[in-house]
Every structure is written in structure tokens, then in C-alpha cells.
Amino acid sequence: MKKLSGVLAGSLLLISASFSQDLKAHAELINTEGEVIGKAELIETNSGVLIKLNAKGLPPNAELAFHIHERGECKPPTFKSAKGHFNPYGKKHGLLNPEGPHAGDMPNIYTDDKGNVRVQVLNPFVTLKKGEKNSLFKEGGTALVIHSGPDDYKSDPAGNAGKRIACGVIR
């Protein structure tokens, strides 16, 4: 039993060491009507930024594009104020594009039959460390955006993902 407790304690120590407790952020997501529909917690890890997303009021049973956009501004109803995908290295769009991806490109998310999503996504291309080229805390900020359709992971500039239906400024 002592051996098991020691292994468990050591495992927990390793897991907690992979997260930087000082580097966290959050975003409150709104829909095109300006209503709060969810939240995201962002945590710096040794492998990138872990994004824990919890939202409701999205299209049911849908595959939706989920990106980080280059401006920390979410003006409904179009959210065009968030500008394009966060792309500090000037790459092409898409996780499947040999000349990509943008730092803000992430896997699609999936909603349940009620339009809810609860997911954790690790983005290895970004950081919460201020002053870094790929920092989400750059001048002008950044935002999380959910689109009305799936990202095809290759079409430039945005993966044919459809309209922007939710947005949250990363703080």
C-alpha cells in the first residue's frame, strides 16, 4: 500500500509539474446575439496551451471549427472584429496543409444532441508567456472563435469553416 501511495504521489507531482500554475487565462464566449454561452480556461503546459472549453447553445450534433483569432475583440453579430486566424509565423492555413498550420488552427469540436460541447484541446503552437512571438497575450490580444461548420484543415485562409457563431476574448 505504501508503494502504491508513493507511486500515486509521484505521478501527481509529475502531472502538476507539467502545468505552470502562474500561466492561466480564460475566455467568456458569446453568441451572435451577445449572450454568454460558455467559457474556456487556458493553461500553459510544457507541450503548449491546454484549452478547456465548455459551451451550450451551439448547433446540435455538429462538427464545428474552433480557432484562435488574431485580435482580442468580439463584436457581434459577425465577430469580424477578431480578424483572421492567429498566425505569427506567416504559415498557410490547415493542420493538413504541408505549408501550415496557423498557430491558431485547432481540431474541430463536436456538439451533442442538445448543442453542448465540453472538450479539452491542446494547442502546441501557442503560449501564454508574454513577450513570445506566439503569445496569446500579444498587443491587441487574441480570441477564441467557433464557426458554423467544420474546418477542412487545408483551404486557405480559414478552412471553409463557415460563419463565426461564437467568440471569446482571451484574458
From Swiss-Prot:
Cofactor: Cu cation; Zn(2+)
GO terms for biological process, alphabetical: removal of superoxide radicals
Signal peptide: 1-20
Pfam family, one: Sod_Cu
Top-level taxon of the source organism: Bacteria
Reactions performed catalytically: 2 superoxide + 2 H(+) = H2O2 + O2
GO molecular function: copper ion binding; superoxide dismutase activity
Disulfide bonds: C74-C167
Keywords: Antioxidant, Copper, Disulfide bond, Metal-binding, Oxidoreductase, Signal, Zinc
InterPro entries assigned: SOD-like_Cu/Zn_dom_sf, SOD_Cu/Zn_/chaperone, SOD_Cu/Zn_BS, SOD_Cu_Zn_dom
Positions that bind Cu cation: H67, H69, H85, H147
Cofactor binding note from Swiss-Prot or TrEMBL: Binds 1 copper ion per subunit. Binds 1 zinc ion per subunit.
PROSITE patterns linked to this entry: SOD_CU_ZN_2
Residues at which Zn(2+) binds: H85, H93, H102, D105
EC nos: 1.15.1.1
Function summary: Destroys radicals which are normally produced within the cells and which are toxic to biological systems.
Listed PANTHER family: SUPEROXIDE DISMUTASE CU-ZN -RELATED
Family from the record: Belongs to the Cu-Zn superoxide dismutase family.
Record-given protein name: Superoxide dismutase [Cu-Zn] 2
Recorded name of the encoding gene: sodC2
